[in-house]
Amino acid sequence: WLHGLGPAALALWLDGVGNPHNFGAILRTAAHFGASVLLPAGSPLALSGAAARVAEGGAEAVTLVRLPPSVEAIDALRRAGFQLAATVVRGGEDLFAVELPARLVLVMGAEGEGMDAALAAACDRRLSIPGSGAVESLNVAAATAVFLSRWAARKASTRSSSRASGLISRSWAR
C-alpha cells in the first residue's frame, strides 16, 4: 500500500471506532477526499452490511489497510514520510491555524473513549477542532469530515499557488 502512494497522501487510522454507522460515514467521507483507511491489528472493525449501506458506494472506493502492531505500523509510516496526528477534543493545536503536511495520518479515536493513550503519545502532533463549547465535541464521523476537508483545503491552496506562479506540480496535474 505505501509503495503506490504519490507525494501527497492522507490516511485515517481508526483506533477503537466500532459503530458501523460511523464507520460507513467515515468510509464515504474518505472516498470523497481520497483518503485510505487504516485498521489496527486486532481491531474487530470490518465492513458490515450496515456500514456499506451508510457508505452508499464509498466503501468500494476506499483502500482499507489492516495494520501490523502499532509500533511497526508507526515506524513504517514515518519511514514513508508520514506525520501522525492524534485528533483530540482538547489540548491540541487549532486545526484551522496550522499548516498540514503533504503526507498525513489522522488518528481518530473511538466514540466516547477517544484513542489509546499510548498511541496518542506516539503521534507527532495533536490537533483539535475549535467549537462553540455548546457540546463537548463532534462525533467521530463528523469530526473526520472536518479534518479531511481541512487537509483538502491545504491541497487546493497548494494547487492555486502553483497555478498563480505559472508552475503546476506534476503530482496535481493529472
What feature does the model see in each segment?
Residues N19, R90-G92, A110-E113, G133:
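Short glycine-rich anion-binding loops that position phosphate/pyrophosphate groups of nucleotides
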Residues H32-S36, A46-G58, E72, A117-A156:
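Structured adenosyl-cofactor binding patch, chiefly the S-adenosyl-L-methionine
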Residues L2-E93:
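RNA substrate-binding interface of SAM-dependent RNA methyltransferases
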Residues R154-S165, S169-R174:
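Low-acidity, Ser/Thr- and Arg-rich intrinsically disordered low-complexity segments
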Residues E99-L100, L119:
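Structural alpha-helical scaffold elements that stabilize or flank donor/cofactor-binding regions
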